[in-house]
Amino acid sequence: MKKQNNLRSLAAQAVEQVVEQGQSLSNVLPPLQQKVADKDKALLQELCFGVLRTLSQLEWLINKLMSRPMTGKQRTVHYLIMVGFYQLLYTRVPPHAALAETVEGAVSIKRPQLKGLINGVLRQFQRQQETLLNEFATSDARFLHPGWLVKRLQNAYPTQWQHIIEANNQRPPMWLRVNRTHHTRDGWLGLLEDAGMKGYPHPDYPDAVRLETPAPVHALPGFAEGWVTVQDASAQGCAVFLAPQNGEHILDLCAAPGGKTTHILEVAPEADVLAVDIDEQRLSRVYDNLKRLGMKATVKQGDGRYPSQWCGEQQFDRILLDAPCSATGVIRRHPDIKWLRRDRDIAELAQLQAEILDAVWPRLKPGGTLVYATCSVLPEENRDQIKTFLQRTPDAALSETGTPDQPGQQNLPGGEEGDGFFYAKLIKK
């Protein structure tokens, strides 16, 4: 059966579910993708990601051009107008097509009586575009981030906060991890070149390759066979710092979707790995990743605060704790994070991280290594967290990463580099 859903109305519904209902775009988008033809999936994704990336600008424009907000059952139209603005500002969709398709979206969401309103607002924007954009360039909304997050970044990074915000507003590069059990990185780069694509090795992470141009995974040499995995360069730093060895008992805590679990097994194929995550639904992706790569690990559902429930009294040679966090280092990959997080979440997350650290530390053998990692750029979850942990944990010592005053290594997002990420390598005395 031919799929003929209006893309613009689907994008508006997706954004509404994220902003109004607090749902993650990664949960909202896949079922909507099933409603459109394959050739239209990329545009639907671009509209959803793009509107969420620039949401504060689009909201600002609506407030300038409409006397009162759309509410109640008409609220989806509010987001449909945003989709129209985004196309006119940021895509190569011809303006006449952007207008026509967006206006027609009102029919799909059963608001045909509002077609004239949508058309009028979008045409008014076209007429006033230059004036409006000049005014927007000096407004508080120009950073495309919620005010609370801008303030936190300014406080934490007085000289770098604008760089972080600019990086967050960019499209991310596509990083891959070459499976060293199949190929050397240089060998796989040769296969990539034979396939007509170009990639660049990361200077610090030995398995990481950045594609010159993002590509679908089925086009990558040996993806189905497990030769390569999509994983950001900074995320690959976790296994690099962990330095797993064959024969060791290793715990990967907060493991879903399994990218770090499989990286550990690529580095140390004969390690005994236990992968644990609290989210049973996301654990299915750990199984999928292990299956594609032909690897074996023990996978369990469990809460990191209560290790006795999922590992008894077992101790480990190495532990990777990729702690639950604000994800403020991966906003360019997941722009919905800006609108799903709240200022109050940060203290709650820091408390949860501390509880997991304290609970899992006794499960590390003396002389063992624990790598604490987050995809956050906020000090409360990173350096401050590790500083206070070291103060209250006499048998913990910092190794390789930072100093007691400035513990850990903080990667900031930017350009063609990896995402924002924090690592602290701790040794049990």
Swiss-Prot record:
GO molecular function terms noted in the UniProt entry: RNA binding; rRNA (cytosine-C5-)-methyltransferase activity
Active-site residues, record numbering mapped to chain: 375
Family matches, as CDD domains: AdoMet_MTases, Methyltransferase_Sun
Any GO BP annotation: rRNA base methylation
Residues annotated as binding S-adenosyl-L-methionine: 254-260, 277, 303, 322
Keyword entries, A-Z: Cytoplasm, Methyltransferase, RNA-binding, rRNA processing, S-adenosyl-L-methionine, Transferase
Catalytic function, reaction form: cytidine(967) in 16S rRNA + S-adenosyl-L-methionine = 5-methylcytidine(967) in 16S rRNA + S-adenosyl-L-homocysteine + H(+)
One GO cellular component term: cytosol
Subcellular location: Cytoplasm
EC number(s) given by UniProt: 2.1.1.176
UniProt region (Disordered), positions on chain: 397-419
Biased composition (Polar residues): 400-412
Family per record: Belongs to the class I-like SAM-binding methyltransferase superfamily. RsmB/NOP family.
The protein's role, per its UniProt record: Specifically methylates the cytosine at position 967 (m5C967) of 16S rRNA.
Protein name: Ribosomal RNA small subunit methyltransferase B
